[in-house]
């Protein structure tokens, strides 16, 4: 019979909440995850009259790597104090982040069909007050870098080990704030 992966040998010593964070996808699993993200992006964009398909598709690999084991997160507790932060500065790339969060269990995948519809929790731009797993409300380009630095500094001052990841676009560099 197959040997247990080394991390499973220590599973009884790790609190259940920590196990969620330690899952690491293999390269094959990351490719599959990125493909699933892209498929869900295409389905979502097809249901709304507008959207940034190219930009959303272009960050699927990055999101797959982050949510496939690099970024500490807990879908059952999206505001978990020990989580790492993701600042999606280019908020119009929400159609990439939403499927990523849904596929990781932050909310049901069926909810993706409600993007940008009245009363939805999935507005066209990321909104931390509506969508589980969103760390920063975005809209205006160029503000994410400063916000990410501020969050990282605040965490450091508090003596916390959380990491802060930033995704921003080339157009933001032209905004004069980066």
Named regions from a protein language model:
Residues 16-19:
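Intrinsic disorder/low-complexity segments
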Residues 1-4:
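Short, small-residue-biased leader/transition segments that mark boundaries at the very start
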Residues 34-50:
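N-terminal capping segment at the start of a domain
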Residues 21-37:
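N-terminal hydrophobic or amphipathic helices/low-complexity stretches enriched
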Residues 41-44, 56-178:
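Cofactor-binding active-site loop characterized by glycine-rich and histidine/acidic residues
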